[in-house]
Amino acid sequence: MAAGAGAGSAPRWLRALSEPLSAAQLRRLEEHRYSAAGVSLLEPPLQLYWTWLLQWIPLWMAPNSITLLGLAVNVVTTLVLISYCPTATEEAPYWTYLLCALGLFIYQSLDAIDGKQARRTNSCSPLGELFDHGCDSLSTVFMAVGASIAARLGTYPDWFFFCSFIGMFVFYCAHWQTYVSGMLRFGKVDVTEIQIALVIVFVLSAFGGATMWDYTIPILEIKLKILPVLGFLGGVIFSCSNYFHVILHGGVGKNGSTIAGTSVLSPGLHIGLIIILAIMIYKKSATDVFEKHPCLYILMFGCVFAKVSQKLVVAHMTKSELYLQDTVFLGPGLLFLDQYFNNFIDEYVVLWMAMVISSFDMVIYFSALCLQISRHLHLNIFKTACHQAPEQVQVLSSKSHQNNMD
């Protein structure tokens, strides 16, 4: 009883930190049902590989464990590459690129079968969907940084900046249109195609050397590295045109609003603020903080992006409003204030402070979120409740995208 009283008398900020969702949000979360549609170009042939791979996954392995393992592999392999190429202008040993290619392929494979494992073990839940998308938000950042290093985009800082943040923007838009329409839509060119393309970039860098991307194409007089950038840009335009077609044509809420009854444009404030802050700090830096430490800079803002994306997913699943105020902006805010006061503290030191603050804030929020939902739904995050045979799981329509459905 004393313990309960102590918990009840805890400061409001502490309760908000340990329990991010309100009682009303938790109730609406119980009613949430995963809804997705669309099949990308590479999904049909890869389904054969994913189905084969699933046979080797033991029934006792929880879907969230598969997701986390894939993320860990992707993060670790990318960090190895970053350690050799902190400015994305260096050339790393060939094996680091192969390691990143393998790490990304493993991540893609495990990310594709976690939903299949959930249905196989009858453990589909809102927690699994949230965990999957939350890990994807962070993986997006590491994929962008790793691929940019492989193509030596650090020699063109503006390209490095553009490719990294546009990658985050596309991921955010995918969930933005989900918040508006209530359904996650996959296009013909989607995340699977991008991941396979990045694996190819890593392999080419391994066998041709990262400097191969600096080769000038005769007649065209452009660097070879611009070709993957243009291909990526084409995919971005294709995907974003589809996303904004859904967003601008109104949502499923009252009077064409979002699933939470808010403006369909409101989520744009969050990603817009991240990008504007990143551009301002980059361009106003007296010490060229981005040019000298691009990977650290992108990772810091990537943590901010990951948390905001996680909150957007939560807003969709709980049909609630997405608020702009967030402690995760403290990190970029420190850099902004340091520039305002003429770099009173060394900008590199402040960048590291911002990285620590943003990463801890993101991890603490996501951990508290998963723990609160697991307690409310009486689920274990990394254990399956039962081992149900595959034939007992309902087969969904082939028109629905099932890869990431937990």
UniProtKB/Swiss-Prot annotation:
Pfam families: CDP-OH_P_transf. Mg(2+) 2 binds at D111, D132, D136. Mg(2+) 1 binds at D111, D114, D132. The active site is at H133 (proton acceptor). It catalyses: CDP-choline + a 1,2-diacyl-sn-glycerol = a 1,2-diacyl-sn-glycero-3-phosphocholine + CMP + H(+); 1-octadecanoyl-2-(5Z,8Z,11Z,14Z-eicosatetraenoyl)-sn-glycerol + CDP-choline = 1-octadecanoyl-2-(5Z,8Z,11Z,14Z-eicosatetraenoyl)-sn-glycero-3-phosphocholine + CMP + H(+); 1-hexadecanoyl-2-(9Z-octadecenoyl)-sn-glycerol + CDP-choline = 1-hexadecanoyl-2-(9Z-octadecenoyl)-sn-glycero-3-phosphocholine + CMP + H(+); 1-hexadecanoyl-2-(4Z,7Z,10Z,13Z,16Z,19Z-docosahexaenoyl)-sn-glycerol + CDP-choline = 1-hexadecanoyl-2-(4Z,7Z,10Z,13Z,16Z,19Z-docosahexaenoyl)-sn-glycero-3-phosphocholine + CMP + H(+). GO terms for molecular function: diacylglycerol binding; diacylglycerol cholinephosphotransferase activity; metal ion binding. It comes from the Eukaryota. It is a multi-pass membrane protein. Coiled coil: none annotated. The record marks E129 as: Increases basicity of active site His. Pathway: Phospholipid metabolism; phosphatidylcholine biosynthesis; phosphatidylcholine from phosphocholine: step 2/2. The chain crosses the membrane at residues 63-83, 94-118, 126-150, 161-179, 191-207, 223-248, 266-281, 294-316, 330-339, 347-376. Highly expressed in testis, colon, small intestine, heart, prostate and spleen. Also detected in kidney, skeletal muscle, pancreas, leukocytes, ovary and thymus. Weakly expressed in the brain, placenta and lung. Overexpressed in cancerous breast epithelial cell lines. Residues 84-93, 151-160, 208-222, 282-293, 340-346 are lumenal. Its cofactor is Mg(2+); Mn(2+). Residues 2-62, 119-125, 180-190, 249-265, 317-329, 377-406 are cytoplasmic. CDP-choline binds at N64, R119. It is found in: Golgi apparatus membrane. InterPro entries: CDP-OH_P_trans, CDP-OH_PTrfase_TM_dom, CDP_ALCOHOL_P_TRANSF_CS, CHOPT. One of its GO terms (cellular component) is Golgi membrane. This is Cholinephosphotransferase 1. It comes from Homo sapiens. The gene is CHPT1.
